[in-house]
């Protein structure tokens, strides 16, 4: 289970079916582990806006995030702008949020500590 190790070090696993959809209690446990992220769409998605100095920094972040998404086989919806990127995670195969969304949110947040 992802909470035995830090979320940013966990790996995504395939999750299909509503039995993998997180309930309110588990969401309340995991949300504090991804500071800056918020529940959206009635708890069906995780959302965060990342701000950057310029377009180059924004694109560096987006490209690094694309590598993580490919590696974890879990892909966010992105809104890319000059000085910000809006990142939204949800697991369509479970009809809401799964632990994979929190794992990828933590990995995404960790990127900002490594980029210029």
UniProtKB/Swiss-Prot annotation:
This is Putative pterin-4-alpha-carbinolamine dehydratase. Keywords: Lyase. Pfam families: Pterin_4a. Belongs to the pterin-4-alpha-carbinolamine dehydratase family. Its EC number is 4.2.1.96. It comes from the Bacteria. It comes from Stenotrophomonas maltophilia (strain R551-3). It catalyses: (4aS,6R)-4a-hydroxy-L-erythro-5,6,7,8-tetrahydrobiopterin = (6R)-L-erythro-6,7-dihydrobiopterin + H2O. One of its GO terms (molecular function) is 4-alpha-hydroxytetrahydrobiopterin dehydratase activity. GO terms for biological process: tetrahydrobiopterin biosynthetic process.
């Amino acid at each position: 289970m992802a909470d035995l190790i830090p979320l940013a070090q966990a790996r995504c696993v395939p999750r299909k079916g509503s039995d993998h959809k997180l309930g309110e209690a588990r969401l309340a446990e995991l949300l504090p582990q991804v500071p800056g992220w918020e529940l959206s769409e009635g708890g069906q998605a995780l959302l965060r806006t990342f701000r950057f100095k310029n377009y180059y920094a924004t694109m560096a972040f987006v490209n690094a995030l694309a590598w993580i998404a490919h590696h974890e086989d879990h892909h966010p919806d992105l809104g890319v702008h000059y000085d910000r990127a809006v990142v939204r995670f949800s697991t369509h195969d479970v009809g809401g949020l799964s632990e994979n969304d929190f794992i990828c949110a933590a990995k995404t947040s960790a990127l900002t500590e490594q980029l210029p």
